[in-house]
C-alpha cells in the first residue's frame, strides 16, 4: 500500500531521518523529518498551470506549530490553534527566503509549502528541521526547483562554534546564527550576536555551510529513489522582445535613472512604461504580438540591467553617490517631549519616528509556545504605513514583512539592553516609518537606539545599522553601502548589518545568485563596518550615551526583596492585602515567585508609602524601637494598638500614662493615633507595648523615664 522510503544520517550528534511515501501522498511532495525526537511534516503542492495575469512567482510558505506536539491543549474559548504566532510568521519567512530564488525564472504556478510541527522534544528547535524538510519535499515534488537546500544553526561558546545547539545551550551562546544554502553557495543568513567581530560572523556562516553538506547529500539520496518526474517547463525566450524594447526605451530609462529624487525618478520610469505600452500594447489593436505579462516582465528586466550596467561601468549609483557613500543623516531626540523617549532618524529619503515607552511588570508580554510560557520585557513594533512611499493601501494588523523587520531590529538592540535586575522596566518601542526609500529596518535600529537613550534606558552602547547591496556580472562586482529601494530590488544580494563600534549584534543576508564567494562576503562586511561607524558618528551629534535619569513622565520603579514565605502575607486572602495597598497608596505592585517586589509609580511618595507598608508586613518589630500605631480596641486592662503592619500589641493599663489610670478610655479611644515603644515579649510571645515612656506629642522617648528605668535596674 505504501511506497515508503527512508534516509538516516548522524548530524550534530543526533539522528536526522527523512521519510516519504507514507503520509500526505496526494501532495506533490511530502517529507516526514525527524531530528532527535522532534518531528515535522513538510508538503508541497504546485498548480498544474500558471496563474494568469501576473508577473511574479506566487509562492506561499506556511509554518505551523500544533500544541499537541508538546502534549498541550490550546488556551482560549475554542481550544484550537488560531492565527499564526510571531514565531510561526518568522519561521515561515526563514523557510521562504532561501528557497524562493531557486525556482526556475519564469515559473508562475501557484505553489504552497506547508510545514507542520507534529512532535517537539523540547531540545531541538523545529525551525532548522522545517527548512530541511521543506527543501526535501520540494526536491521530490518534480517542480522546477534548483535545490536542494541545507540549513544549520550555529552557536558560539568559549571561542568555539557549535552546530545546532540544544535549546538549553542557547542561554550560554554569544551567537544565534541560522544559515541556509546549496552545496556550493550560501543563500540566507539570520542572526543575533553579542558584539562579535566581522571575521567571527563570517566564520560562523562558512562553518554552517560546511556542516549542512551531509544534509544536502541525504536529500539527494532520498530523491534518487523517491523523486517524481520533473515537470516540463521551459522558460520563455523573450530575447527578441528585449531587443525591440531596448530600441524604444533604453535612452529614456538611462535618463530616468540619473534622476536623484525618488518621486521624480518614478514619474520618469512610469512615462517610459507608458511609452512601452503604447509601442507594444496599443489601444484598439485586435491582437498583440506579446502578452501584457511578457511586456511587464521584460520591462522589469530592462530596468535592472540598465541600473546594473551604470553601476558596474561608471561606479555611479541612481542618486549620484559612489559605492561607499551613505546618504545624508539627520538625527533628533526628544521630539515628543511628553513621551518617555523619542527620536526621528532620517537618512536620505528614509525616515523613522521612534518612540520608547517604559512600563511595569503588569505590561510584560506573555508568549505561549511549545516550550512553555515566556515573559517578554522588551517589545519592538515596526509599522510601515502606505503614505511612507506616497501610496494608498491597507491599514490593519501587521503583515509578515512588518513582523520580520521588527524582529530584525529587536535582535540588533536586544544584546545591549541592561539585565532586568539592573533595570526592572518593561520596554516597548514603536517605529513608525514616515518615509521610505530603502533600509527602513536599519533606520529603525538607529532610531530605537536614540529613543531608548533619550528615555534614560542604560543601553550599554549606541547601536546602528546599515543595509548593503551587491551587483555581480561575471568577474566584476560592486558592493553598495546604504542601498536605495531600487538597488535592493535590482541587486544580487542585500544584507543588513547592525552593531556597535566594537562588533556586530545582528546580521541578515539574502543572496539571489550563486558564485558569491567567501572573499566577496568579507569585502562586503568590512565595507558595512565602515558605514556603520560613520552612522554612529552622525547619531552621536544628537545623543552619544544614555541620559542619566528617566524622562519626566516615565514611571519610577523601586525593587525590594521579601522572604518567599512572606509572599502570602503581602498578597492576603484572595488578594485582599495587596489590593488595599494599591488602592490606598496609588502605586502598582508586582510580586514574583522568588520574592522580588517591584513598586511602580510616577510619584515618589506613593512608592515610599507602598514600600513601608510591605516592609511592615514582612519585617519583624524590634525591641526598644518606637512605632506609630492606631488604637483598635479598648478593654478594662488596657488598649490594643495596631503598630506594625498587621501586627497588634497590648498596652497594659499601667503603661498608658506616667500617672495612675483608673479607666482605659480616660486616656485613649478606638481610632486614636498613638506612639508606642516595644518593650519586649512575654513568655507566650505576646507583644508588650508602652505609651508612658514616649512623648505623645513628639514621638520621642522620655529621657527621665529612661533614667528611672536605669536606676530601678541598678537598684
Swiss-Prot record:
- Tell me if Transcription is a UniProt keyword of this record: no
Q: Which residues form the KH domain?
A: 555-614
Residues forming coiled coils = none
What are its E.C. numbers?
A: 2.7.7.8
Q: Where in this chain does the record put each S1 motif domain?
A: 624-692
Q: Which InterPro entries match?
A: ExoRNase_PH_dom1, ExoRNase_PH_dom2, ExoRNase_PH_dom2_sf, KH_dom, KH_dom_type_1, KH_dom_type_1_sf, NA-bd_OB-fold, PNPase
Protein name listed in UniProt: Polyribonucleotide nucleotidyltransferase
The family line of this record is: Belongs to the polyribonucleotide nucleotidyltransferase family.
Keyword ATP-binding listed? The answer is no
Cofactor names from the entry are:
Mg(2+)
What organism does the record attribute this protein to?
Chelativorans sp. (strain BNC1)
Instruction: Look up the record and give one Gene Ontology term from the biological process aspect.
Output: mRNA catabolic process
- The record's disulfide annotation reads none
Any idea which positions bind Mg(2+)? 488, 494
The reactions it catalyses are: RNA(n+1) + phosphate = RNA(n) + a ribonucleoside 5'-diphosphate
Instruction: Provide this UniProt record's keywords sorted from A to Z.
Output: Cytoplasm, Magnesium, Metal-binding, Nucleotidyltransferase, RNA-binding, Transferase
The compartments listed are: Cytoplasm
HAMAP family tied to this protein = PNPase
Gene3D superfamilies reported for this sequence: GHMP Kinase, N-terminal domain, K Homology domain, type 1, Nucleic acid-binding proteins
Q: Which gene encodes it?
A: pnp
